[in-house]
């Protein structure tokens, strides 16, 4: 009996001990859970404060990605340390200068919670692309860098850009009677037209000042026209259509284009303003007032005999677009986009050939490069200012813009064949005189005031910048992370490795499917681009044939009138009536032939247009 009681007592003590251990483990788990919740609330509060701080700084968006970008920038600043900043002045030995300008974050981007994803340091520009790992939670950044001649951040002034990119071109045109061209290139809405307007504002006073110092026997005339869907339109004379012709000597002439005298800087700016007011713009996905044409301002320096003594081109290129961005457009918008991208591709090849000092420059690739043929001569100078949008949603567009500029820059560097100290020794900088700097500073006062107002408008904090939407998005994001953390607490010890394997396999299959889908979409877009280009060419042929028919009919109408008058006189012999019938039959045959040619062109155009619309529908379905 005593032995039984002892066994029962021992068993009771063992059970009690196990209960105490279980209770202690539960209490420990509860304590850890409270600690996690406390830490989570602290992190939530810290993220909220960081989110509000970013909004006040004019940079809303994902707190984690913004933090990663800022951390990366601090590391870069530490690496740079006390290194001297790059010079703002251009070198004299290069025929090609490539620069990039980053604009400030816009109100529209703030409302979309779009954070700043572009950084500029020491003539290099980085694009930070936000990514998620396979788990769909862990965030990280990828960095794409590009080394260019000059990089300008959102705080750069128009004066700095002018000194680095355009000032040496003015010296080249005035001193050597040469040719020079400034291009502004980039995604629609990235600030091309704004940058070009600032350059023109300063150029107006700097060019006239340099001419006054060097010579007094030259006068300035200006031609301002746009290239829209393959048509040359004179912006200074009611958008009259001009013809692009090439004579037997290879000289390109724009018939019907008139030059306007500009005796003073004020007259020059008035001409520029008039031209900009008539430029073709349309609404696109990226910009409500996107420039859909290449605006070309040509400044001619002529002596009093009319002989050309220098030429400077200011080209504001149309906004570049990818094929997938035009899937919702009608045929006219798609034709515009195809023509824009074709001309930009041809322009890149011409500038590369110029940088390589190639014997052949493919300027016949588009009407844009054909117009600028004389600017691609070996002794000409070219500057390209690539503009990029800082928003994360535009990262792909910014990458394409910088790759375009980098291809040109890469070819120029390799063609020079100079590296290290040898290259630096030949890069003699252009240092303008004190009087010229003062003149430029005075000229930029108005432009800089506009720039400052623009920056303040873009960077100022608004009381109602989608505050409710921001708070909702932030709370939703934090709640999702909290739910993920809690789910991880309860499931971290019961994860199944087979499930992970199957998840990885599903992910790989999804990636492969997405790749195949992307390849199919790219092929469809390429076919659509070729078809749109064919539609554009057939449209041009149809219009030319129609015009030829009208002219031929007018000539025949005059001849028919004379023939009819000769018959109506009366007293005609049988032979004369027979000749009348023969000539009338010839007129009818000619008219029938003209109608047949025009009808054939029309049928071919309509057939190709129907094919273009069908391909556009297929590409749209492929995108989704």
UniProtKB/Swiss-Prot annotation:
Its main location: cytoplasm. Belongs to the TRAFAC class myosin-kinesin ATPase superfamily. Kinesin family. MCAK/KIF2 subfamily. Residues 1-59, 478-528 are annotated as: Disordered. This is Diatom spindle kinesin-1. InterPro entries: Kinesin-like_fam, Kinesin_motor_CS, Kinesin_motor_dom, Kinesin_motor_dom_sf, P-loop_NTPase. CDD domains: KISc_KIF2_like. The keyword Cell division does not apply. It is found in: Cytoplasm, Cytoskeleton. It holds the Pfam family Kinesin. The lineage of its organism: Eukaryota, Sar, Stramenopiles, Ochrophyta, Bacillariophyta. It comes from Cylindrotheca fusiformis. GO terms for biological process: microtubule depolymerization; microtubule-based movement. GO terms for cellular component: cytoplasm; microtubule. Residues 95-411 form the Kinesin motor domain.
């Amino acid at each position: 009996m005593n032995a039984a009681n002892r066994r029962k007592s021992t068993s009771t003590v063992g059970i009690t001990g196990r209960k105490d251990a279980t209770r202690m483990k539960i209490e420990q788990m509860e304590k850890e859970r409270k600690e996690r919740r406390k830490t989570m609330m602290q992190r939530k509060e810290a993220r909220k404060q960081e989110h509000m701080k970013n909004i006040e700084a004019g940079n809303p968006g994902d707190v984690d990605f913004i933090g990663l970008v800022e951390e990366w920038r601090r590391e870069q600043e530490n690496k740079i340390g006390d290194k001297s900043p790059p010079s703002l002045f251009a070198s004299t030995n290069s025929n090609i200068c490539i620069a990039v300008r980053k604009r400030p974050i816009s109100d529209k981007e703030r409302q979309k919670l779009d954070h700043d994803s572009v950084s500029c340091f020491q003539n290099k520009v980085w694009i930070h692309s936000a990514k998620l790992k396979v788990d769909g939670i862990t965030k990280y950044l990828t960095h794409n860098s590009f080394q260019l001649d000059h990089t300008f951040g959102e705080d750069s002034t128009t004066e700095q850009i002018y000194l680095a990119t355009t000032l040496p071109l003015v010296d080249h045109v005035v001193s050597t009677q040469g040719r020079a061209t400034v291009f502004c290139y980039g995604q629609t809405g990235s600030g091309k037209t704004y940058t070009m307007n600032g350059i023109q504002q300063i150029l107006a006073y700097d060019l006239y000042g340099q001419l006054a110092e060097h010579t007094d026997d030259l006068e300035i005339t200006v031609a301002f026209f746009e290239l829209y869907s393959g048509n040359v339109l004179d912006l200074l004379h009611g958008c009259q259509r001009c013809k692009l012709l090439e004579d037997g000597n290879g000289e390109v002439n724009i018939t019907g284009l008139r030059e306007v005298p500009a005796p003073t800087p004020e007259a020059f700016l008035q001409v520029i303003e008039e031209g900009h007011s008539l430029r073709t713009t349309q609404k696109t996905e990226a910009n409500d007032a996107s420039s859909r044409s290449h605006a070309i301002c040509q400044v001619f320096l002529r002596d009093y005999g009319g002989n050309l003594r220098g030429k400077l081109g200011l080209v504001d290129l149309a906004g570049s677009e990818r094929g997938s961005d035009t899937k919702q457009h009608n045929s006219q918008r798609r034709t515009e986009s195809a023509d824009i991208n074709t001309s930009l591709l041809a322009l890149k090849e011409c500038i590369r050939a110029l940088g390589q000092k190639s014997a052949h420059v493919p300027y016949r690739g588009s009407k844009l490069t054909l117009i600028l043929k004389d600017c691609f001569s070996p002794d000409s100078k070219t500057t390209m200012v690539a503009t990029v949008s800082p928003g994360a949603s535009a990262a792909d567009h910014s990458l394409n813009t910088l790759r375009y500029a980098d291809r040109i820059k890469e070819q120029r560097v390799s063609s020079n064949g100079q590296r290290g100290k040898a290259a630096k020794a030949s890069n003699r900088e252009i240092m303008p005189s004190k009087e010229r700097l003062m003149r430029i500073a005075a000229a930029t006062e108005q432009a800089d005031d506009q720039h400052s107002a623009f920056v303040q408008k873009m960077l100022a904090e608004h009381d109602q910048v989608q505050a409710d939407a921001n708070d909702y998005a932030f709370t939703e994001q934090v709640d999702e992370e909290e739910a993920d953390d809690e789910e991880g607490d309860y499931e971290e010890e019961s994860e199944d490795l087979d499930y992970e394997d199957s998840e990885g396999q599903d992910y790989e299959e999804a990636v492969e499917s997405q790749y195949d889908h992307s390849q199919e979409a790219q092929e469809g877009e390429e076919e659509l681009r070729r078809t749109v280009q064919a539609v554009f060419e057939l449209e041009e042929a149809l219009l030319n044939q129609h015009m030829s028919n009208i002219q031929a009919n007018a000539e025949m109408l005059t001849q028919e009138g004379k023939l009819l008058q000769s018959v109506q006189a009366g007293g005609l012999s049988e032979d004369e009536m027979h000749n009348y019938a023969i000539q009338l039959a010839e007129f009818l045959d000619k008219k029938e032939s003209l109608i047949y040619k025009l009808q054939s062109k029309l049928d071919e155009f309509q057939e190709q247009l129907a094919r273009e619309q069908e391909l556009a529908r297929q590409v749209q379905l492929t995108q989704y």
